[in-house]
Protein backbone atom coordinates (compact mmCIF):
# COMPACT_ATOMS: atom_id res chain seq x y z
CA UNK A 1 0.00 0.00 0.00
CA UNK A 2 2.93 2.25 0.78
CA UNK A 3 4.39 1.79 -2.76
CA UNK A 4 1.07 2.71 -4.30
CA UNK A 5 0.86 5.85 -2.18
CA UNK A 6 4.42 6.89 -3.23
CA UNK A 7 3.62 6.37 -6.91
CA UNK A 8 0.58 8.62 -6.61
CA UNK A 9 1.47 11.90 -8.34
CA UNK A 10 1.18 15.28 -6.68
CA UNK A 11 -1.95 17.14 -7.60
CA UNK A 12 -2.43 20.89 -8.01
CA UNK A 13 -4.89 21.65 -5.20
CA UNK A 14 -5.19 25.38 -6.11
CA UNK A 15 -6.38 24.75 -9.66
CA UNK A 16 -9.85 23.40 -8.77
CA UNK A 17 -11.84 25.14 -11.53
CA UNK A 18 -12.32 22.89 -14.53
CA UNK A 19 -10.15 20.12 -13.08
CA UNK A 20 -12.44 17.44 -14.48
CA UNK A 21 -11.95 18.68 -18.05
CA UNK A 22 -8.10 18.64 -17.81
CA UNK A 23 -6.46 15.37 -18.95
CA UNK A 24 -4.75 13.09 -16.42
CA UNK A 25 -1.18 13.84 -17.63
CA UNK A 26 -1.70 17.60 -17.11
CA UNK A 27 -2.88 16.94 -13.55
CA UNK A 28 0.70 16.34 -12.42
CA UNK A 29 2.35 19.58 -11.18
CA UNK A 30 5.90 18.69 -12.32
CA UNK A 31 4.76 17.70 -15.80
CA UNK A 32 2.65 20.84 -16.14
CA UNK A 33 5.49 23.13 -15.05
CA UNK A 34 8.04 21.45 -17.34
CA UNK A 35 5.91 22.10 -20.42
CA UNK A 36 5.87 25.70 -21.65
CA UNK A 37 2.43 27.02 -22.71
CA UNK A 38 1.74 28.06 -26.27
CA UNK A 39 2.48 31.72 -26.84
CA UNK A 40 -0.43 33.56 -28.44
CA UNK A 41 0.67 36.91 -29.90
CA UNK A 42 -2.04 39.45 -30.44
CA UNK A 43 -1.98 42.55 -32.66
CA UNK A 44 -1.69 44.82 -29.63
CA UNK A 45 1.65 43.30 -28.68
CA UNK A 46 3.06 44.05 -32.15
CA UNK A 47 2.06 47.70 -31.85
CA UNK A 48 3.85 48.16 -28.52
CA UNK A 49 7.33 49.77 -28.61
CA UNK A 50 10.34 47.55 -27.82
CA UNK A 51 11.13 47.42 -24.12
CA UNK A 52 14.59 48.67 -23.18
CA UNK A 53 16.41 48.87 -19.88
CA UNK A 54 16.76 52.41 -18.58
CA UNK A 55 20.32 53.81 -18.20
CA UNK A 56 19.82 54.23 -14.44
CA UNK A 57 19.37 50.47 -14.07
CA UNK A 58 22.38 49.61 -16.23
CA UNK A 59 24.72 51.78 -14.12
CA UNK A 60 24.18 49.67 -11.04
CA UNK A 61 24.59 46.35 -12.86
CA UNK A 62 27.70 44.36 -12.03
CA UNK A 63 29.76 42.96 -14.89
CA UNK A 64 30.71 39.33 -14.79
CA UNK A 65 34.00 40.14 -16.61
CA UNK A 66 36.69 42.20 -14.89
CA UNK A 67 36.80 45.70 -16.47
CA UNK A 68 40.35 47.00 -16.93
CA UNK A 69 41.25 50.60 -15.98
CA UNK A 70 41.73 53.25 -18.66
CA UNK A 71 45.51 53.45 -18.26
CA UNK A 72 47.23 50.11 -17.91
CA UNK A 73 50.71 49.96 -16.54
CA UNK A 74 53.13 48.64 -19.14
CA UNK A 75 54.97 45.49 -18.14
CA UNK A 76 58.69 45.57 -17.50
CA UNK A 77 59.50 43.42 -20.56
CA UNK A 78 57.79 45.85 -23.00
CA UNK A 79 59.15 49.14 -21.64
CA UNK A 80 62.09 49.24 -24.03
CA UNK A 81 60.14 47.83 -27.01
CA UNK A 82 60.23 49.86 -30.25
CA UNK A 83 57.45 49.15 -32.75
CA UNK A 84 58.33 48.19 -36.33
CA UNK A 85 57.66 50.48 -39.29
CA UNK A 86 54.27 49.98 -40.93
CA UNK A 87 53.21 51.33 -44.31
CA UNK A 88 49.57 52.42 -44.73
CA UNK A 89 48.03 51.20 -48.00
CA UNK A 90 45.09 53.64 -47.84
CA UNK A 91 47.31 56.69 -47.28
CA UNK A 92 50.57 56.37 -49.22
CA UNK A 93 51.59 59.95 -48.33
CA UNK A 94 51.74 58.97 -44.66
CA UNK A 95 55.20 57.61 -43.89
CA UNK A 96 55.52 56.06 -40.49
CA UNK A 97 58.93 56.33 -38.90
CA UNK A 98 60.35 55.84 -35.44
CA UNK A 99 61.41 59.50 -35.31
CA UNK A 100 57.80 60.75 -35.37
CA UNK A 101 56.79 58.68 -32.35
CA UNK A 102 58.29 59.86 -29.09
CA UNK A 103 58.31 57.38 -26.24
CA UNK A 104 58.77 58.78 -22.76
CA UNK A 105 59.55 56.09 -20.22
CA UNK A 106 58.60 56.65 -16.64
CA UNK A 107 58.51 54.42 -13.59
CA UNK A 108 54.81 53.63 -13.82
CA UNK A 109 53.30 54.56 -17.23
CA UNK A 110 54.65 54.71 -20.79
CA UNK A 111 53.48 57.93 -22.52
CA UNK A 112 53.39 57.76 -26.34
CA UNK A 113 52.98 61.08 -28.23
CA UNK A 114 51.67 60.64 -31.78
CA UNK A 115 52.22 63.20 -34.57
CA UNK A 116 49.40 65.17 -36.21
CA UNK A 117 47.15 63.30 -38.58
CA UNK A 118 48.06 63.60 -42.31
CA UNK A 119 44.38 64.15 -43.19
CA UNK A 120 44.32 67.28 -41.02
CA UNK A 121 47.41 68.62 -42.77
CA UNK A 122 46.01 68.06 -46.27
CA UNK A 123 42.50 69.41 -45.60
CA UNK A 124 43.47 72.36 -43.37
CA UNK A 125 44.55 74.60 -46.29
CA UNK A 126 41.36 74.07 -48.30
CA UNK A 127 38.65 76.75 -48.19
CA UNK A 128 35.34 75.44 -46.95
CA UNK A 129 32.41 75.89 -49.36
CA UNK A 130 29.28 77.46 -47.93
CA UNK A 131 28.87 78.52 -44.34
CA UNK A 132 27.20 77.70 -41.09
CA UNK A 133 24.05 79.21 -39.64
CA UNK A 134 25.81 82.04 -37.83
CA UNK A 135 27.28 83.51 -41.03
CA UNK A 136 23.92 83.48 -42.80
CA UNK A 137 22.37 85.23 -39.83
CA UNK A 138 25.05 87.94 -39.92
CA UNK A 139 24.58 88.44 -43.67
CA UNK A 140 20.82 88.72 -43.28
CA UNK A 141 21.24 91.24 -40.46
CA UNK A 142 23.74 93.63 -42.03
CA UNK A 143 23.31 93.07 -45.80
CA UNK A 144 19.56 92.43 -45.91
CA UNK A 145 20.14 88.94 -47.29
CA UNK A 146 22.40 87.79 -50.10
CA UNK A 147 22.27 90.03 -53.16
CA UNK A 148 20.63 88.66 -56.27
CA UNK A 149 22.51 88.82 -59.62
CA UNK A 150 20.04 91.42 -60.94
CA UNK A 151 20.73 93.66 -57.97
CA UNK A 152 24.50 93.34 -58.47
CA UNK A 153 24.11 94.33 -62.16
CA UNK A 154 22.07 97.39 -61.19
CA UNK A 155 24.73 98.52 -58.75
CA UNK A 156 27.48 98.05 -61.34
CA UNK A 157 25.52 100.08 -63.92
CA UNK A 158 25.00 102.91 -61.43
CA UNK A 159 28.74 103.11 -60.77
CA UNK A 160 29.60 103.04 -64.50
CA UNK A 161 27.16 105.82 -65.50
CA UNK A 162 28.79 109.32 -65.66
CA UNK A 163 27.60 112.32 -63.66
CA UNK A 164 26.15 114.07 -66.76
CA UNK A 165 23.88 111.17 -67.54
CA UNK A 166 22.68 111.17 -63.94
CA UNK A 167 21.84 114.90 -64.06
CA UNK A 168 19.88 114.42 -67.32
CA UNK A 169 17.89 111.56 -65.85
CA UNK A 170 17.11 113.65 -62.76
CA UNK A 171 15.81 116.54 -64.92
CA UNK A 172 13.64 114.23 -66.99
CA UNK A 173 12.23 112.61 -63.88
CA UNK A 174 11.36 116.03 -62.38
CA UNK A 175 9.49 117.14 -65.52
CA UNK A 176 7.59 113.86 -65.74
CA UNK A 177 6.65 114.10 -62.07
CA UNK A 178 5.05 117.50 -62.66
CA UNK A 179 2.97 116.21 -65.58
CA UNK A 180 1.87 112.98 -63.88
CA UNK A 181 -1.15 113.40 -61.56
CA UNK A 182 -0.62 110.19 -59.55
CA UNK A 183 2.73 109.34 -57.99
CA UNK A 184 1.90 105.67 -57.39
CA UNK A 185 1.60 105.03 -61.15
CA UNK A 186 5.22 106.11 -61.75
CA UNK A 187 8.09 103.62 -61.57
CA UNK A 188 10.65 103.68 -58.78
CA UNK A 189 13.44 104.98 -61.02
CA UNK A 190 11.46 108.18 -61.73
CA UNK A 191 10.63 108.75 -58.07
CA UNK A 192 14.27 108.38 -57.08
CA UNK A 193 15.38 111.97 -57.81
CA UNK A 194 12.38 113.65 -56.18
CA UNK A 195 12.94 116.60 -53.84
CA UNK A 196 10.91 116.32 -50.65
CA UNK A 197 11.53 119.91 -49.50
CA UNK A 198 9.12 121.17 -52.18
CA UNK A 199 6.39 118.90 -50.86
CA UNK A 200 6.97 120.07 -47.29
CA UNK A 201 6.67 123.71 -48.37
CA UNK A 202 3.42 122.94 -50.19
CA UNK A 203 2.03 121.30 -47.07
CA UNK A 204 2.92 124.35 -44.98
CA UNK A 205 1.18 126.64 -47.48
CA UNK A 206 -1.92 124.43 -47.50
CA UNK A 207 -2.09 124.54 -43.72
CA UNK A 208 -1.99 128.35 -43.87
CA UNK A 209 -4.84 128.40 -46.41
CA UNK A 210 -7.23 126.69 -44.02
CA UNK A 211 -6.80 122.96 -44.58
CA UNK A 212 -5.87 122.54 -40.93
CA UNK A 213 -9.28 123.76 -39.78
CA UNK A 214 -10.99 121.48 -42.32
CA UNK A 215 -9.11 118.42 -41.09
CA UNK A 216 -9.96 119.30 -37.50
CA UNK A 217 -13.66 119.52 -38.32
CA UNK A 218 -13.52 116.20 -40.20
CA UNK A 219 -11.83 114.44 -37.30
CA UNK A 220 -14.40 115.88 -34.90
CA UNK A 221 -17.28 114.63 -37.06
CA UNK A 222 -15.73 111.17 -37.37
CA UNK A 223 -15.20 110.93 -33.63
CA UNK A 224 -18.81 111.98 -33.00
CA UNK A 225 -20.10 109.30 -35.40
CA UNK A 226 -17.91 106.65 -33.82
CA UNK A 227 -18.99 107.53 -30.29
CA UNK A 228 -22.74 107.41 -31.04
CA UNK A 229 -24.67 105.06 -28.77
CA UNK A 230 -21.88 104.80 -26.20
CA UNK A 231 -22.23 105.79 -22.55
CA UNK A 232 -19.61 108.37 -21.68
CA UNK A 233 -18.49 109.26 -18.21
CA UNK A 234 -18.36 112.92 -17.25
CA UNK A 235 -14.76 114.12 -17.44
CA UNK A 236 -13.88 116.62 -14.73
CA UNK A 237 -11.19 119.00 -15.94
CA UNK A 238 -9.43 121.73 -14.01
CA UNK A 239 -7.41 124.55 -15.51
CA UNK A 240 -4.85 125.95 -13.09
CA UNK A 241 -2.77 129.08 -13.74
CA UNK A 242 0.36 129.87 -11.80
CA UNK A 243 1.38 133.51 -11.44
CA UNK A 244 4.90 134.37 -10.40
CA UNK A 245 5.39 137.16 -7.85
CA UNK A 246 6.74 140.52 -9.06
CA UNK A 247 9.81 140.56 -6.83
CA UNK A 248 11.34 137.50 -8.59
CA UNK A 249 13.58 138.76 -11.41
CA UNK A 250 15.52 136.20 -13.39
CA UNK A 251 18.64 136.71 -15.48
CA UNK A 252 16.69 136.26 -18.71
CA UNK A 253 14.31 139.10 -17.92
CA UNK A 254 17.27 141.38 -17.12
CA UNK A 255 18.93 140.53 -20.44
CA UNK A 256 15.70 141.15 -22.34
CA UNK A 257 15.30 144.53 -20.65
CA UNK A 258 18.85 145.54 -21.62
CA UNK A 259 18.25 144.51 -25.24
CA UNK A 260 15.01 146.53 -25.29
CA UNK A 261 16.80 149.64 -23.98
CA UNK A 262 19.51 149.27 -26.62
CA UNK A 263 16.93 149.06 -29.39
CA UNK A 264 15.15 152.17 -28.14
CA UNK A 265 18.45 154.08 -28.05
CA UNK A 266 19.25 152.98 -31.60
CA UNK A 267 15.87 154.15 -32.84
CA UNK A 268 16.31 157.52 -31.10
CA UNK A 269 19.75 158.01 -32.65
CA UNK A 270 18.41 157.04 -36.05
CA UNK A 271 15.72 159.72 -35.84
CA UNK A 272 18.27 162.36 -34.82
CA UNK A 273 20.56 161.47 -37.74
CA UNK A 274 17.65 161.55 -40.20
CA UNK A 275 16.57 164.99 -38.96
CA UNK A 276 20.12 166.34 -39.28
CA UNK A 277 20.42 164.97 -42.82
CA UNK A 278 17.15 166.59 -43.82
CA UNK A 279 18.35 169.96 -42.43
CA UNK A 280 21.62 169.71 -44.39
CA UNK A 281 19.71 168.91 -47.60
CA UNK A 282 17.49 171.96 -47.09
CA UNK A 283 20.50 174.19 -46.56
CA UNK A 284 22.16 172.88 -49.72
CA UNK A 285 19.03 173.50 -51.78
CA UNK A 286 18.61 177.08 -50.44
CA UNK A 287 22.22 178.23 -51.23
CA UNK A 288 21.86 178.31 -55.08
CA UNK A 289 18.59 180.31 -54.81
CA UNK A 290 20.30 183.20 -52.96
CA UNK A 291 23.00 183.37 -55.64
Swiss-Prot record:
GO terms for biological process: deactivation of mitotic spindle assembly checkpoint; intermediate filament cytoskeleton organization; mitotic sister chromatid segregation; mitotic spindle organization; protein localization to kinetochore. GO terms for molecular function: microtubule binding; structural constituent of cytoskeleton. GO terms for cellular component: astral microtubule; cytoplasm; intermediate filament; kinetochore; mitotic spindle; nucleus; protein phosphatase type 1 complex; spindle microtubule. It is found in: Nucleus; Cytoplasm; Cytoplasm, Cytoskeleton; Cytoplasm, Cytoskeleton, Spindle pole. Induction: Induced during G2-M transition. Disulfide bonds: none annotated. InterPro entries: Fin1. Its main location: nucleus. The modification Phosphothreonine is found at residue 68. The modification Phosphoserine is found at residues 54, 74, 88. Residues 254-284 form a coiled coil. Phosphorylated by CDC28. Phosphorylation is required for BMH1 and BMH2 interaction. Dephosphorylation by GLC7 depends on the presence of BMH1 and BMH2. Keywords: Coiled coil, Cytoplasm, Cytoskeleton, Nucleus, Phosphoprotein. Forms cell-cycle specific filaments between the spindle pole bodies of dividing yeast cells. Homooligomer; in vitro, FIN1 self-assembles into 10 nm diameter filaments. Interacts with the 14-3-3 proteins BMH1 and BMH2, and the protein phosphatase 1 complex catalytic subunit GLC7. Strong overexpression results in the accumulation of filamentous structures resembling the neurofibrillary tangles found in cells of patients with Alzheimer disease. Overexpression is lethal in haploids and causes very poor growth in diploids. The coiled coil domain is essential for dimerization. This is Filament protein FIN1. It comes from Saccharomyces cerevisiae (strain ATCC 204508 / S288c) (Baker's yeast). The gene is FIN1.
Amino acid sequence: MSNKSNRRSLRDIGNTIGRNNIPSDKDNVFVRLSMSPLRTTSQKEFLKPPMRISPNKTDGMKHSIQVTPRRIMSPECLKGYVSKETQSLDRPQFKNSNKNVKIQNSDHITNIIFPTSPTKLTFSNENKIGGDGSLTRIRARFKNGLMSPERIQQQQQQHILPSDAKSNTDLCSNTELKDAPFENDLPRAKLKGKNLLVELKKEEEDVGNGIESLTKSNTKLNSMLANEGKIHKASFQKSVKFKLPDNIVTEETVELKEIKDLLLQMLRRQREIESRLSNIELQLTEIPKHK
